């Protein structure tokens, strides 16, 4: 398994950032994400919920495997392959930066792809995380 990591800071508090991103089915703040729905009659943040959503020009499905409001994090995994990305498990976490009342956000993933594709997927995932969190930053600044 290969890994990806991206982190950034936000001017808002961890609670304010988490309030926007905590909803597993409310992923429209992310880059390239369109209409989303939970397909298996679970609550949006219920472990086992499968979201079916538009990601750029394709339909993608992901399963929520962990969610904690206390720890301000959730993890999800692919339900089906995405090109040569056979599987992945991603975690999004928000932590407070106490001395400045701001937030630290990290996005990590473990993924399975052919070895010759690891660098390409690491770059792709990093770029998408950066664009998504920048879109979130813009959204929060407008609130």
Short names for language-model regions:
Residues 6-8, 60-66, 88-96:
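Hydrophobic/aromatic beta-strand elements that line small-molecule binding cavities or substrate pockets
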Residues 11-15, 66-71, 93-104, 138, ...:
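A short, structured loop/turn motif at beta-sheet edges
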Residues 79-131:
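Beta-strand/loop substructures that line and gate deep hydrophobic ligand-binding cavities in soluble
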Residues 1-43:
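Hydrophobic ligand-binding cavity/cleft-lining segments
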Residues 4-6, 49-51, 62, 90, ...:
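Hydrophobic residues positioned within well-ordered beta-strands of beta-sheet architectures
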Residues 25, 37-83, 131, 139-143:
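Glycine-rich portal/gate segments that line the openings of hydrophobic small-molecule binding cavities
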Residues 9-13, 54-56, 67, 79, ...:
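Solvent-exposed residues in well-ordered beta-strands and their adjoining turns
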